[in-house]
Amino acid sequence: MMTDSSVYVLFADGFEEIEAVTPVDILRRMELDVVLVGVTGKQVRGAHGMELTMDRTLNQLKNQTPAAVILPGGMPGTRNLDATRPVGELVCRTAEAGGVVGAICAAPMVIGRLGLLRGRRATCFPGFEEHLLGAEKVSDRVVTDGRFVTAAGAGVAADFAFAVGTLLKDSVSAAFVRRSMQFSD
């Protein structure tokens, strides 16, 4: 059962900045409650040196189950997410409760290694396909299968965010924000 209507974006040291910040921005423009969650602490440093202050840390969330959880890619950020057991527990709880699970770039490996992509279509950054256990690997840049959204990398961070937002809200809201930000239809 979901205990929090928020979207949790998980930040681990070494996260890919565009893949993390773009979904935060777009989903907030869609008037969703987005919480920046630090996996490795309250201050988290990205793969390219950007340092961000988190709203909450993973330890503060206890057994919360959000409406959605987003895993940005980047290295070593993805490996840090994958190595943190409470991340897997949170992702599994969210999926079991019918929440949205989104992962971009290398991060689909985290949900793939948890077995959550079995029988689903999924994509990821080239070279990480072996971790999409049981998934139908496709070369599309953004893939939505049920309540799961996967994406290939930084260049599609906005499309990824709009796909997540469409599942959480609706396509009309996503299209409105997309147009207001001057994205082409």
Regions found by a protein language model. Give the residues of each.
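Extended, subdomain-level signal for the structured scaffold at the beginning of enzyme domains
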Residues: 1-97, 110-113, 118-119, 131-139, ...
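Short, hydrophobic beta-strand segments that form beta-sheet elements in well-ordered domains
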Residues: 36-38, 101-105, 120-125
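Beta-strand-turn-beta hairpins that frame and shape the catalytic cleft
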Residues: 143-148
